[in-house]
Amino acid sequence: MDTRLIAIATFVVTFGILIVLKRLNYIESWDTFSILSILAAVLTIAAYFFTLVLFPQDYDQLKKEILDEINESLKNYEIYFKCKDFKKPIVKDGAVRIDKCVVMATKLNLTDHGYIVDLKFRSNWMDSKGTHAILFIDGDDAQINLFEREGEIFYIIKSKNKISGVYIQLKSVKWFDEAFSDNWNNIKIMWDTSKDEIWLEINGIRVSKKLNFDFNLNDSVIYLGSNPLEDTYAEGYFDRIMVYKSADTADFGTPTVRRFE
């Protein structure tokens, strides 16, 4: 139990006992009652700080518990997301909130099927210090805010029930293909929800024409990739986008593939 709650409960019980003793005339004067009440408050505060020194809270353990809870809750979400509805927020437990529907590719995996990008979702949100958010996850009991500052990657974990503001510096981001290392913060998938159009931008320049889909992109999983059978594969270019339409992340279903033009 929280030490502060114990201290408050102790004072309330002590004060209640003093009131009972006064009503039973064991404490005759109000002056004596006032002095004893003040003494009880002082002793309670002293005991509270003594307890903090004698039994310090294990913040590392609490931090680990939060991380474990978050990792467990995120196992089933992979790169699943829902776009934010502007009439009301639509945020599934552990899912990613994308402000203005802008996401960022930050990690490249080289597979037998070509380059597959695990999307690290990005919003346009800037905090008071001007750092740019990379990932924001909002769950029932905790929030994760991953962001970049001066080339280093950090994340803050906030929990409603435990620690608020655990601030952790991550190891530097490693790219699987160094050819893409200069594109950090510069590759964006742009999505116009009103028209269900999606396109790719690098360094703010639109490098592909709009791609029209015959279904709503909500509840979709998006991959960027390249074809290992084409020359562009060796040069590390993205040449296609894959959209998995499924409401359940455990079953991605059949991908819809569109090439960049």
UniProtKB/Swiss-Prot annotation:
Keywords: Cell membrane, Membrane, Transmembrane, Transmembrane helix. The chain crosses the membrane at residues 4-21, 33-55. It comes from the Archaea. Its main location: membrane. SUPFAM superfamilies: Concanavalin A-like lectins/glucanases (SSF49899). InterPro entries: ConA-like_dom_sf (IPR013320). It is a multi-pass membrane protein. Signal peptide: none annotated. It is found in: Cell membrane. GO terms for cellular component: plasma membrane. This is Uncharacterized protein AF_2291. It comes from Archaeoglobus fulgidus (strain ATCC 49558 / DSM 4304 / JCM 9628 / NBRC 100126 / VC-16).
